[in-house]
Regions:
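Hydrophobic, membrane-interfacing alpha helices
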Residues: 1-389
Length: 389
């Protein structure tokens, strides 16, 4: 396991760069997930635009105005945080020994933070001042759907993280009550379906606001969501963030299968779960007592397969909404299956004692079937470009 990129570079390339301790492996793959997803979503929105399914909207902007107070303040705050926390980490002796604790603490370098804040604010002022006109002009510009990708992903990231935390704490209410502040600010403890539901709701509201047809947007998102989830699960597997399966002491069904593909102890996992590894000193020196199913790895494999299926179908399916229905069906099946061997909280009072994810996966599966079957009827009642609601 590689808790952060420092250990990955040290093991794979023999390079020791202390600054890489600040880059959590799971966080790195989440960032990579958003970058790749943005690229693929842009490609799909452009394709739908060329098909005439999506159109531009017009907005008025002011050209030649000086930097506003809010712009200067935002850039100052970004620079201050960067200097205070990131650069400051290299000026504090023990900051990199426990990067996560340092990031969540109030420690940092005040003077470097102030200097970087002034520098970022100054850059914004200089940039706007170069473009300043004696009489600022108001112009009307065309905004295409692919130009909105960065805004869409900001909504996805913000509301996705919020939803993932809320659903996780609802599922683990006892742990939340014991330490509510720690549960809320911790980087661990995220529930995918919580993020999917909250981010999805926020993006659909944003799409309605900018008059972007939701039915075509969700179809564009179908392969993107599977691809992004697969990349994110790579981070779970490599960092050992606790997203593993139940104990697996059974024999491999196939003799040539690698041991780590059937059962694993997650040595050097990022959450420090298990018992000390003999001969290991320093942080991240624990491994699980018993072998468990590497469920995150299984999800990586399954979700990449589903992504390629959706990607191959996207040009063949002509009925709007049907591709997203297929995504919901696959999503529900995949998650329901993996939950049967995954460590999670079960609702003992319900029939077959499901997990929160299994309940939601059943709902998504049914919704996917309904959307797949009914989408043609809905399209016949509404012109494709009018399917905004």
């Amino acid at each position: 396991m590689y808790p952060n990129l420092y250990y990955a570079f040290k093991d794979l390339f023999g390079i020791e760069l202390s600054g890489l301790k600040l880059v959590n492996t799971f966080g790195f793959f989440v960032a990579l997930c958003f970058i790749v997803s943005a690229w693929v979503l842009t490609l799909e929105l452009k394709r739908k635009q060329q098909q005439g399914l999506l159109n531009f909207t017009e907005e008025k902007i002011v050209i030649g105005a000086p930097a506003s107070f809010s712009e200067l303040l935002i850039n100052f705050l970004l620079g201050f945080i960067f200097g205070y926390k990131i650069i400051g980490a290299f000026t504090i002796a023990d900051a990199l020994n426990d990067p996560q604790r340092y990031i969540l603490s109030s420690r940092g370098n005040l003077w470097i933070g102030l200097l970087m804040g002034l520098f970022f604010g100054g850059l914004k002022w200089y940039e706007k001042n170069k473009q300043k006109l004696a009489n600022p002009e108001e112009r009307t510009v065309r905004i295409w759907p692919q130009d909105r990708v960065s805004d869409i992903l900001i909504y996805a990231a913000g509301f996705g993280f919020l939803g993932a935390k809320i659903f996780h704490n609802l599922e683990n209410w006892g742990d939340f009550i014991k330490d509510p502040i720690g549960a809320l600010i911790s980087f661990s403890g995220l529930t995918f379906y919580g993020g999917l539901i909250c981010a999805g709701a926020a993006i659909m509201l944003f799409a309605r606001k900018i008059k972007l047809p939701i039915v075509h947007l969700v179809d564009a998102f179908a392969p993107v969501l599977m691809l992004g989830y697969a990349i994110g699960r790579i981070g779970c597997q490599i960092s050992g963030d606790g997203d593993w399966g139940i104990v697996n002491n059974t024999r491999k069904p196939i003799s040539w299968m690698p041991d780590w593909l059937w059962s694993y102890q997650y040595p050097h996992n990022v959450i420090g779960e298990g018992v000390p590894i003999p001969g290991c000193s320093g942080p991240y020196c624990n491994q699980l007592i018993q072998l468990v199913y590497p469920t995150a790895l299984y999800e990586v494999i399954m979700c990449f397969i589903v992504f390629f299926i959706l990607w191959s179908l996207r040009k063949k399916i002509k009925i709007p909404g049907r591709l997203f229905g297929i995504y919901l069906i696959f999503n529900g099946l995949e998650r329901f299956a993996i939950e049967s061997i995954r460590v999670n909280t079960h609702y003992e009072s319900l029939p077959f004692k499901p997990t929160q994810a299994q309940i939601i996966s059943i709902i998504l599966f049914i919704a996917g079937i309904v959307l797949f079957v009914q989408s043609k009827k809905w399209v016949e009642k509404n012109k494709p470009n009018e399917l905004v609601d």
